Amino acid sequence: MSDSVILRSVKKFGEENHAFESDGFHNNDKKSRLQDKKKGEGARVGFFELFRFSSSKDNWLMFMGSVCALLHGMAQPGMIIVFGILTDIFVEYDIERQELSIPEKVCMNNTIVWINSSFNQNMTNGTSCGLVDINSEVIKFSGIYAGVGVAVLILGYFQIRLWVITGARQIRKMRKFYFRRIMRMEIGWFDCTSVGELNSRFSDDINKIDEAIADQMALFLQRLSTALSGLLLGFYRGWKLTLVILAVSPLIGIGAAVIGLSVAKFTELELKAYAKAGSIADEVLSSIRTVAAFGGENKEVERYEKNLMFAQRWGIWKGMVMGFFTGYMWCLIFFCYALAFWYGSRLVLDEGEYTPGTLIQIFLCVIIAAMNIGNASSCLEIFSTGCSAASSIFQTIDRQPVMDCMSGDGYKLDRIKGEIEFHNVTFHYPSRPEVKILNNLSMVIKPGETTAFVGSSGAGKSTALQLIQRFYDPCEGMVTLDGHDIRSLNIRWLRDQIGIVEQEPVLFSTTIAENIRLGREEATMEDIVQAAKDANAYNFIMALPQQFDTLVGEGGGQMSGGQKQRVAIARALIRKPKILLLDMATSALDNESEAKVQGALNKIQHGHTIISVAHRLSTVRSADVIIGFEHGTAVERGTHEELLERKGVYFMLVTLQSQEDNTHKETGIKGKDTTEGDTPERTFSRGSYQDSLRASIRQRSKSQLSHLSHEPPLAIGDHKSSYEDRKDNDVLVEEVEPAPVRRILKYNISEWPYILVGALCAAINGAVTPIYSLLFSQILKTFSLVDKEQQRSEIYSMCLFFVILGCVSLFTQFLQGYNFAKSGELLTKRLRKFGFKAMLRQDIGWFDDLKNNPGVLTTRLATDASQVQGATGSQVGMMVNSFTNIFVAVLIAFLFNWKLSLVISVFFPFLALSGAVQTKMLTGFASQDKEILEKAGQITNEALSNIRTVAGIGVEGRFIKAFEVELEKSYKTAIRKANVYGLCYAFSQGISFLANSAAYRYGGYLIVYEDLNFSYVFRVVSSIAMSATAVGRTFSYTPSYAKAKISAARFFQLLDRKPPIDVYSGAGEKWDNFQGKIDFIDCKFTYPSRPDIQVLNGLSVSVDPGQTLAFVGSSGCGKSTSIQLLERFYDPDQGTVMIDGHDSKKVNVQFLRSNIGIVSQEPVLFDCSIMDNIKYGDNTKEISVERAIAAAKQAQLHDFVMSLPEKYETNVGIQGSQLSRGEKQRIAIARAIVRDPKILLLDEATSALDTESEKTVQLALDKAREGRTCIVIAHRLSTIQNSDIIAVMSQGVVIEKGTHKKLMDQKGAYYKLVITGAPIS
């Protein structure tokens, strides 16, 4: 066959289609996307844009809710007009009473006359009298108060209910749109976006938008209505005084604008810091086995805390700014009081323009307006936070994906042959534009042929597969299918024609049957069974208790690697694809399974185009065409024989392979052709599905270190069967009793100086309002004085007091804001840190629990810690403020008239009852809502973590459907919450009007019959009214208080849990001369999440110090489980693991793990530099750069690292996604070498490497094994033949053991496995 590649002419079919773009434009488009991302980060969202998801029904609900809020807001200014009229009546009555108290004066003909004066004198100087019937006037006004109270009850209920409902509807829609848009994004977008950050946006950011568009809008409109109607009434009753009071309003407006911008900026910075911290938490919790194995718990807590520090700093700044603004507002308001009474008294006394009642009406209307503008400003902070949170959400929603997998655009071919051509394709990943992966690649893949790609790690083999699936588009050149540029084809249709089986298969948290059905939605049960048989999975599935209904756990964590692989192959086969892509598809299988699966794959070859990347020798040798890759280019093409003659890349790989096989043959296998499929297994090269890209962002590495996580089932298939049925049980487990506030505050105890100063300032601020009511009533009393000079003198004194109050408020409000922000942010940081630390403290079995998958835990860290501030921080300040307000107000009231105070106090129990009901009900709703959103979080986390698999098999729609089912439940909870919250709020608002009605009725009686001064009635009523407002305000904190207690309870539940294997505990045995002798004595074990399946069934095997023990056996026989017992991820149910004669259960966990190093098949790396990843091998001390480089050299890594632009400072990406598998594996080996362990565990340690690298790394491992006890797990028997002991396992027990020679001579299970690949039984 010719070496040259013949390229056919391309039909540029559908050039008018937007999917078909010129190369230059396409490349520019990618660059512009990255620029857009940078520009978009600072983009602001306008407030009204928050309501972009409202439907016509929502508009109607918002309109009606707004009408109710606006009418409710008018109630208070309206009653001020009534109050002014009442004031004039009381003043007139008091003047009459004072005049008639003079013995020489009497009331005759409605005029006060001197008994001894002439008629003319009396007519000139007389004051009218007897015209006021106080009793009947008071009854009339009491009736008006009662009527308004009832109206407020109705309006208050509907304003809250309607706004909460419309908020819930819009947030539900927003979550749907956001998730749908994310699921439509091209893979390149995920390369540059962290899953942890996206999960944080789903929970934290959307919750902040929810707060901004629900009940807060109702409260804002109510306060705005009060402010506007107050101003209008002020102008109507007296424009002069109104203008004087408003003279300071520009100062308020300027202050509000400056503060609003500052708060928005600080909020944005705070959210970014929290998103970064969330990303770290997600990465760590997803790789918990690796963290535990290398003792990285404390290092990870420090890394997490570092990002929390930034968030804390911005939170404190935000609190300071808000505190200053509140003080600034109060200061201006009190200065207004002083100015108003000074100027107003002149208009009343000197010019006679106003009556005292008119002055009070104007003053109170304008001041109520100003106060409500101040109160409304607290809503502005929430709106501003909502807008900041929305910017990244809306930016994602508005972003048009470059490749929309759910779009109907593009052509669908009637029939396809399956001919694929690469035309001068050049490509780099969006996340690493400086590294060229494919360089002018040209090749033809003929239909119906099996084509094998071979080449060293990082040569671009797997990248070529990703371009065929259109996960990316070439930067230059084109890929064609049957002569059509694949950019002109419909993406969903294209991927439906392709089956993919990768080396690290991803299964989803549902049943085995549903996982297979994901390959083809309309597949019947017969199709599923047949696919399982074709993939050699049927027998092991039928051996499980629930057979095809067995739940596989998150990422297939409940199964061994081989079992996962076979289910993934069944999923690909059921698609009946025209093109089958095999990326190391049988690497995780033992010999017997591999041979059978390979046979199944060969059976379907006819009529299919098969592309196999770096398969075993038998597969590559029998391929119709072999294409050799080097540096991103196809350098040779031909059959096995042709390429051997050519003596190029392929020849070199085969030569290396043959040398190892010859070595193997000499040790006991004679006359057997090593090129047959059932011989010792070897791999040509490693091109993982994650080569040089961020695949692992979504691909949770489920290695032997990280794959046995038994996570909750999620409904991507049959939603009810795999998810709904478990709901009731979950709820029972999840319910928590709200935490006592005392304990929450205990965690804030180290900030007691801040809390004390803040509380003192809050107490002063709380006392200011009742003192104001005292001064106010005193001014009213002044107007009834007969001597005008005395009136002036007293009014000026009151004005001076107001100025002093303003100055005090400025100072105390600022200190309150700062101190509580400081204490609250420190508490949030502490709780997040403690929560994260407590999570890392838990045993691995805890992470297997369906409630504790990474998505749920990350969501919990993000929301719970910040919600605990609802019972601490600034909320404490507001509570202290309110309670002081109530105490001082009640004290003043009882001092001046205890009878009237008692009558009004009758209404307090009703307020308290309303608050208690509100707290109780909302606590319940908060608990339900949190649980539902956590379940939704599990769905998003699983989908986004495995986005390549989701896109490859086209199940985006299933995840979207499952997610939306959970959202419906959350919506129903919100509807119930709306009714309770609305009723309680309405009651707390309306009761004050009813209390006023009763107070004025009884006050009128006391004035007439007990000669009480009218100013005392005002003093008592306004004091109690102030305290009632404070009570109402206290209960407005109950929703966040309720959430806080639930969130805190979850934290305490976590902090209180004492894990059976405690990594932080100092207890346990330690000894100096650690040898590394290991004895498994009759170990029996079942995983906590699957107690019905016995994994180890009496395992007994020993290895002396410095010896190598190799475990051999079929997939799922318990090999990896034994390693997990040795690492103390679990303890055996029965039997003992002995280390140097010590029972492992009694050995200190950190001490034990510090003497063990591990290299697993699918290594987990962290999102930091190569140097930091190597140093992660030993977290007990600072590793020198020299020592790390020495380890890298030993692992054959150094030369590769030095070829990178940033050398050892190169960031590996999340989960090592910027590197090929071979590169990742060598870093993992260097990490283990740096640890200098006494016991070395190698779990398929070289399986990820190409032949060239493997040989050198194997030598490095052999060297690393010297003087160490070593346990090796390998399917490839040639890697373990030199072991001191080979233990053959079957069904959780060792069935034979000995050296390679001894076992070959015995001709038992091991011999059969080596020679024939027969089952071990």
Curated annotation (Swiss-Prot):
The modification Phosphoserine is found at S587, S692, S703, S706, S1321. Its main location: membrane. Residues 420-656, 1078-1316 form the ABC transporter domain. SUPFAM superfamilies: ABC transporter transmembrane region, P-loop containing nucleoside triphosphate hydrolases. One of its GO terms (biological process) is canalicular bile acid transport. Residues 662-684 have a biased composition (Basic and acidic residues). One of its GO terms (cellular component) is membrane. It is a multi-pass membrane protein. Disulfide bonds: none annotated. Residues 662-722 are annotated as: Disordered. Residues 62-385, 755-1043 form the ABC transmembrane type-1 domain. The modification Phosphothreonine is found at T586. The chain crosses the membrane at residues 63-83, 148-168, 216-236, 241-261, 320-340, 354-374, 756-776, 795-815, 870-890, 891-911, 980-1000, 1012-1032. GO terms for molecular function: ABC-type bile acid transporter activity; ABC-type xenobiotic transporter activity; ATP binding; ATP hydrolysis activity; bile acid transmembrane transporter activity; canalicular bile acid transmembrane transporter activity. It catalyses: cholate(in) + ATP + H2O = cholate(out) + ADP + phosphate + H(+); taurocholate(in) + ATP + H2O = taurocholate(out) + ADP + phosphate + H(+); glycocholate(in) + ATP + H2O = glycocholate(out) + ADP + phosphate + H(+); glycochenodeoxycholate(in) + ATP + H2O = glycochenodeoxycholate(out) + ADP + phosphate + H(+). It is found in: Apical cell membrane; Recycling endosome membrane; Endosome; Cell membrane. Disruption phenotype: Transgenic mice with up-regulated liver canalicular membrane expression of Abcb11 appear healthy and normal and demonstrate any difference in longevity. Transgenic mice exhibit a normal reproductive rate and gender distribution and are born in a normal Mendelian distribution. Transgenic mice have food consumption identical to their background strain controls. Transgenic mice manifest increases of both bile flow and biliary lipid secretion and are resistant to the development of hepatic steatosis. Residues 84-147, 237-240, 341-353, 777-794, 1001-1011 are extracellular. It comes from the Eukaryota. The uptake of taurocholate is inhibited by taurolithocholate sulfate with an IC(50) of 9 uM. Pravastatin competitively inhibits the transport of taurocholic acid. Cyclosporin A, glibenclamide, rifampicin and troglitazonestrongly competitively inhibit the transport activity of taurocholate. The canalicular transport activity of taurocholate is strongly dependent on canalicular membrane cholesterol content. The uptake of taurocholate is increased by short- and medium-chain fatty acids. Cholesterol increases transport capacity of taurocholate without affecting the affinity for the substrate. Expressed predominantly, if not exclusively in the liver, where it was further localized to the canalicular microvilli and to subcanalicular vesicles of the hepatocytes by in situ. Pfam families: ABC_membrane, ABC_tran. PANTHER family: ATP-BINDING CASSETTE SUBFAMILY B MEMBER 11, GENE 2, ATP-DEPENDENT PERMEASE MDL1, MITOCHONDRIAL. Belongs to the ABC transporter superfamily. ABCB family. Multidrug resistance exporter (TC 3.A.1.201) subfamily. Catalyzes the transport of the major hydrophobic bile salts, such as taurine and glycine-conjugated cholic acid across the canalicular membrane of hepatocytes in an ATP-dependent manner, therefore participates in hepatic bile acid homeostasis and consequently to lipid homeostasis through regulation of biliary lipid secretion in a bile salts dependent manner. Transports taurine-conjugated bile salts more rapidly than glycine-conjugated bile salts. This is Bile salt export pump. The gene is Abcb11.
